[in-house]
Design a protein with these regions (language model features):
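Interdomain "pre-motor" coupling segment immediately N-terminal to P-loop NTPase/helicase cores
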Residues: 1-9
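P-loop NTPase motor core
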Residues: 9-72, 76-86, 95, 164-285
Length: 314
C-alpha cells in the first residue's frame, strides 16, 4: 500500500474539513439565540444540546426547526420523546408567537399557547358531508378560531418544509430516509434528533448495552452528518449533577457515553437562571464546545414555554 492509498484509507466521501475551511462553508442560521451561542449558527456535523430538567431544550429545538422551515429550508425532525401532534402544535404555536400581527390571506396571526389546541370531540359540531358545505365551513371557521386560522396559514408557509417523524427508532432507518430524500434532490438542510439516548442502532449486540448503544448511535449520527454535509442538532439528557458542579457545565454532564460530547462539532448546555415570571423563565446557554468559535461563553435569554419560544433577555 502506497502512502497516498494510506491517506485515503479512511477519507470520507466528501472532504468535510476542506469544505468548511478552504471553501468557507457558512453556518446554517437558526435565527435563535443558538446562533449567538455558536458564533454564527449550526455547522455540518453534530451539535449536542443538553439541558437540566424543564430548562427548555425541546422548546429551543422546536424553535430552531420552525425558524429554519419558515425560511423554506427543509428540516427533518426525528423524535421518540414526543409525538407528531405535540411537536406540530408546539411548532405552530412558536410560529404564531414570532409572526403575531402579520396578515396572510385576510387572516391576522394571533399567538396561542400550544396547549390550547382543541381536543374535545364535543366541541366539534355535526357537519353535513356535502364537500362544498364542508369547504365553506372550514373557510369560515379559520377566520373565527385563532388556532385554526394560524394553522391554515402555517400549513401553507412552514409545514411544507418541516417533516416530523415519531415512528423511526434506529440510526439505520434515519440514514435510509435521509439518503432517499437526498437521492430525490430534496435533502434536508437540518436534521433534529430528540433525543440521542432513546434511539438504537438496530443491532442487538450493541443495543443491549446502554453505554455501547449511546456511543454507537452518536458515532453513526456523526458519520451521517459528515457524509451528507448536513448539520444535525442532537438533544441529550444529562447525568445527575453534584451540587459543587452545578455552576460549571462541561462535556462530562452529558448522560451515557463520553462519545456524545466528544464526537460533536459543538455542544451547548441549558441551565435555568434566577429571573422568572408569568409564562417565562430565564435560561442560560453555556457553550462547552465549539470548533468554530469561543467556548465558555454564556448566552442569557428567556424561555416562553407555553409557546416553545426563546426570546431576548431583558
Amino acid at each position: 500500500m502506497g502512502f497516498q492509498e494510506l491517506r485515503n484509507f479512511s477519507h470520507p466521501e466528501h472532504s468535510w474539513a476542506v469544505d468548511c475551511y478552504l471553501q468557507g462553508t457558512k453556518p446554517l442560521l437558526t435565527h435563535t439565540h443558538l446562533d449567538e451561542a455558536l458564533n454564527g449558527g449550526l455547522m455540518p456535523g453534530l451539535t449536542i444540546l443538553g439541558g437540566v430538567a424543564s430548562a427548555g431544550k425541546s422548546s429551543l429545538a422546536v424553535h430552531v426547526a420552525t425558524n429554519v422551515a419558515a425560511t423554506r429550508q427543509r428540516v427533518a425532525y426525528f423524535t421518540l420523546d414526543d409525538t407528531w401532534g405535540n411537536v406540530t402544535a408546539r411548532s405552530i404555536s412558536c410560529w404564531s408567537f414570532a409572526t403575531q400581527g402579520a396578515r396572510y390571506q385576510d387572516i391576522e396571526i394571533v399567538p396561542f399557547r400550544w396547549s390550547d389546541v382543541l381536543n374535545r370531540t364535543d366541541e366539534i359540531p355535526k357537519l353535513d358531508l356535502d364537500p362544498l358545505k364542508l369547504s365553506a365551513y372550514a373557510f369560515n371557521m379559520r377566520k373565527q378560531n385563532k388556532v385554526l386560522g394560524d394553522a391554515a396559514v402555517y400549513e401553507d408557509v412552514v409545514a411544507p418544509y418541516l417533516a416530523v417523524i415519531d415512528s423511526v427508532a434506529t440510526t439505520t432507518e434515519i440514514e435510509q430516509l435521509l439518503k432517499t430524500a437526498a437521492a430525490d434532490g430534496e435533502a434536508p438542510e437540518l436534521v433534529v434528533i430528540d433525543y440521542v439516548q432513546q434511539f438504537q442502532t438496530g443491532s442487538s449486540d450493541v443495543d443491549n448495552s446502554d453505554y455501547a448503544r449511546v456511543s454507537e448511535v452518536a458515532t453513526r449520527l456523526q458519520q451521517i452528518a459528515l457524509s451528507m454535509n448536513v448539520p444535525i442538532l442532537v438533544l441529550s439528557s444529562l447525568k445527575k449533577i453534584d451540587a459543587k458542579e452545578k455552576d460549571d457545565p462541561s462535556l462530562d454532564w452529558f448522560r451515557g457515553s463520553g462519545v456524545v460530547g466528544y464526537a460533536s462539532w459543538a455542544a451547548v448546555i441549558i441551565t435555568r437562571g434566577e429571573k422568572q415570571g408569568s409564562g417565562f423563565q430565564e435560561i442560560k446557554l453555556h457553550t462547552v464546545k465549539n470548533k468554530a468559535g469561543r467556548t465558555g461563553q454564556v448566552t442569557k435569554c428567556l424561555l416562553k414555554g407555553p409557546y416553545s419560544y426563546i426570546s431576548d433577555f431583558y
